[in-house]
Amino acid sequence: MKENEDEINKTDEKYKIKNPSNNGNNKNKNNNNNNNNNNNNNNNNNNNNNNNNNNNNNGNSNLENIEGLNKYNIYKKKKGKNESNTSLNNIYISSPNLSERSDNSIGSYCTNKTMKSENSIINIETLFRDSVSEQNSDECGSKVDKDLDEDDDDDDDETEVPELVDYSEMIVSILYPVCITMVIVVLAIRAISSSTSKNSQIVEISNDNSGGNGDSSSGADKMVFDSVVNSLIFLAVIILSTTIMVVLYKFKLMKALYAWLMGTSILLLGVFGGFLFLILLAYLNLGLDYVTFVIVVWNFSVGGIVCIFWYSPKLLNQGYLISISVLMALFFSRLPDWTTWGILSIVSIYDIFAVLCPGGPLRILIETAQKRNENIPAMIYNASIYIGMIYNEDNLENNNNNNNNNNIELNINEVDIENNNNNEDENKNNTEDGNNNNNKNKNNNNNNNNRIENENGAENSSENGSITPPPTIPNFIKDEKEINRSSGSNGFPNFKKCANDNILIGDAETNDEIVSNAESSIDSTISESYVKPKQSIRLGLGDFVFYSVLIGKAASYQITTVFTVFIAIITGLFLTLILLAVFRRALPALPMSIIFGIIVFFLTFKILIQYIYFLGENQIFV
């Protein structure tokens, strides 16, 4: 037994390990010595018991060969239950002074230290090293990632249910622009068609398409043939333009792609917008000179290009996208009736193929954009409703930099703590076996002049009200307010220097503050780095256009058809968005709304309106 104690004491003396858990025992021992000065025999017995506790604690210390820690890592382990004692689970401290030991055979060793205070017990696991290696830091990182993945799985399970509830906000956000577009188209068509000239032109076009009253069969055949041919030509143009866009994006010809998109936007805003502007001036009987007209159209076109393809306020960008949809819908609605119905039907069928089939051009475009983690390079209306935190690449890079800054090597070359009013009580006790253990308890009452020097020898002090935290402890304390709150009179935390070791150990309040600040910093970093944003709903401008074409064609007949078709389109879009939330994949937005709209239009025009006329002629009121 005595030989084991001698070997352990020599090991302690060689590596200068001092277990803080014994400080509490020594403190109690000193109190016993001060209170019972006359009982020397009892003091010797207490000393023997304390020395035995020292030997047992040193014997139970974990000696681990860890291949170098040059990172300073703090992370919180979630155990699933609350503990009454405040504990800092893992603090990895790398001390270069300890790495200069002559004995390299041990490599590194670990000892558990416990510091007892009046209100709490703080467990500190201190790891020393004498060689530099990245392997352990990678292991620590993988361990943290594993814990975070488990937490993310739990969070996903918790947030999976309310996601469908919050999905209603995105549905409403996409219904607003669709309704605005259709209302503007209806108002424009009703205003234009109310004039005498436009009414006469509409009658002449309808008579030409009907083929005259003489031969109704040949007129019907010609009308169907013309509508089919026009629809196929229009579909061929759509397929060609979509294929060109996919090829340009697939081969990363982004300049050509955006030049093409900008050219079409200028054509829509400048030419179609200018022509519609002339019609409105004629309808309102307003005069305008050509110079002012050109300036207005030019500013409108260039402003649209800037807002759509560059930076602009969100509402302005969405306003220009709605304007483009309105312009296209107004001109497509001027096509003959059966050509319009044929185009809407064929485009709806093609939309199913383009989005859902494996070889569809739109599906290829979507999959390519997802693989590259990029937005689809097209004029697409984005609902931009993110439930949770908005996430972008800049925030990702900043969070990664912050996470890398958390892993900083803690090099303490020199720690000098000067105390003006220090009361030192030194008690030297001799064991009966002849082994001498010197236990020193240093009680610091006033810490007025503390100085912590970094590895370059530069001093960090608080002068002229400027407080700079130690650079070796980056994320313990986040700002000056927390530094002042958890610091002594000069702005630095109250640390104590462990005897025979260059290890900083804080008192109870300082350690509690460090634990709370570190845990809150880690939790905020985890939430910023691992919280993924909710995907927003994006609807192509083509969907806006064809919805508006359908309701615009209905507006050229009766106001009753406008309301019924409007309800049918919104119902189809709503069902499509519900399916989008269920299947969680890209779905075509045209088929359900267009099919419902066409069916409701003919039912309203052939049945409901005739029924309303019948009730009105017979003066039957329901």
Swiss-Prot record:
Where the record places motif PAL is: 588-590
Basic and acidic residues: bias regions: 1-16
Protein name per Swiss-Prot or TrEMBL: Presenilin-A
Pfam families annotated for this entry? Presenilin
Which GO molecular function terms does the record list? aspartic endopeptidase activity, intramembrane cleaving; endopeptidase activity
Domain text from the record?
The PAL motif is required for normal active site conformation.
Name its species.
Answer: Dictyostelium discoideum
Record-level GO cellular component terms: endoplasmic reticulum membrane; gamma-secretase complex; Golgi membrane; membrane raft
